């Protein structure tokens, strides 16, 4: 395997490069100098913000803007995915989804109609209501943004920034699916599945969180498998070594392409090795595949290996993905 080629493909992948702009946004805000009524437990750099509302409970807040390329390629799928990605963000934190709001900007009414059909179908599939929002009826372009609220116990949150040295790196996927016909970077595992299974897959993360089996977790999103892991390690101020040949993948898909894919249901976690069997069993109960693929290290670099050779993908002492 040509690891240098893999590294080059990952480092130049648009799904990762688009995250660099986050740093400028983060540096604008400073919560340390403000006096807020509620406890901001987690803010930028995670799948959702976490705000404590009393001694035991927290609300989770997340938002996603749908990639313009996706909306142009397939408006229905863009609408459906706006629900999917938000629900997965809450699930990755070990939370339960409560409700969503949206902002939709309309230039083309036919496209808008398809987007809204997709949103409606997503709501039916994932069982999370769309309860309000804002509409721009005279916009210069078509844009869809969705926000979501979730709930969780304060002591049962799966954070991105809590990876520990020596943790095993675990990738978990639903491998039963298909590349989405009009957007090859998406692996669809939900449209053909029952509501019961799709929702159970999200609840699996709640079970892992409440049993305190993992130290950190992140939903695999637009940066792909390695990019998402890189973001987790960056905010944890750690590094890692990952054997990319051990990452679960469908046999028919090229490895480099798979490392860039946004899966319908996929997560990267770090956990003590002794907890892996229980984590694996929880995922298997909802028809997902989980494997140990690497280890968290103190050196702030992310390496990939094929079992023989090793290459640096990111050096967090010198560079960043999101700057959080």
UniProtKB/Swiss-Prot annotation:
One of its GO terms (biological process) is thiamine biosynthetic process. CDD domains: PurM-like3. It comes from the Archaea. SUPFAM superfamilies: PurM C-terminal domain-like, PurM N-terminal domain-like. One of its GO terms (molecular function) is thiamine-phosphate kinase activity. InterPro entries: Methan_mark_2, PurM-like_C_dom, PurM-like_C_sf, PurM-like_N, PurM-like_N_sf, ThiL-like, UCP036540_AIR. Pfam families: AIRS, AIRS_C. NCBIfam families: methan_mark_2. This is Uncharacterized protein MJ0640. It comes from Methanocaldococcus jannaschii (strain ATCC 43067 / DSM 2661 / JAL-1 / JCM 10045 / NBRC 100440) (Methanococcus jannaschii).
């Amino acid at each position: 395997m040509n690891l240098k080629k893999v590294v080059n493909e990952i480092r130049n992948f648009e799904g990762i490069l688009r995250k660099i702009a986050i740093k400028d946004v983060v540096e604008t805000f400073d919560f340390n100098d403000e006096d807020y009524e509620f406890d901001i437990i987690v803010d930028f750099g995670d799948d959702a913000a976490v705000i404590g509302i009393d001694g035991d409970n927290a609300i989770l807040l997340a938002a996603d803007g749908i990639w313009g390329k996706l909306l142009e390629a397939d408006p229905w799928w863009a609408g459906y995915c706006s629900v999917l990605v938000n629900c997965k963000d809450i699930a990755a934190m070990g939370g339960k989804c409560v409700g969503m709001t949206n902002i939709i900007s309309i230039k083309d009414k036919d496209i808008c109609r398809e987007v809204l059909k997709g949103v409606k179908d997503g709501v039916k599939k994932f069982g999370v209501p769309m309860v309000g929002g804002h509409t721009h009826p005279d916009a210069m372009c078509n844009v869809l943004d969705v926000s979501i609220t979730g709930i969780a116990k304060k002591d049962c949150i799966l954070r991105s920034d809590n990876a520990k040295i020596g943790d095993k790196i675990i990738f978990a996927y639903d491998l039963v699916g298909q590349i989405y016909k009009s957007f090859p970077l998406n692996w669809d595992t939900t449209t053909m599945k029952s509501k019961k299974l799709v929702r159970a897959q999200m609840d699996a993360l709640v079970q892992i969180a409440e049993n305190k089996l993992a130290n950190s977790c992140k939903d695999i999103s637009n940066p792909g498998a390695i990019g998402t892991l890189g973001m987790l390690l960056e905010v944890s101020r750690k590094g890692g070594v990952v054997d990319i040949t051990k990452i679960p993948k469908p046999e028919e898909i090229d490895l480099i392409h798979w490392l860039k894919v946004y899966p319908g249901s996929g997560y990267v976690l770090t956990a003590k090795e002794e907890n892996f069997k229980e984590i694996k069993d929880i995922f298997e109960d909802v028809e997902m595949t989980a494997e140990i693929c690497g280890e968290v290290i103190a050196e702030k670099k992310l390496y990939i290996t094929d079992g023989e050779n090793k290459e640096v993908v990111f050096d967090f002492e010198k560079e960043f993905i999101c700057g959080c």
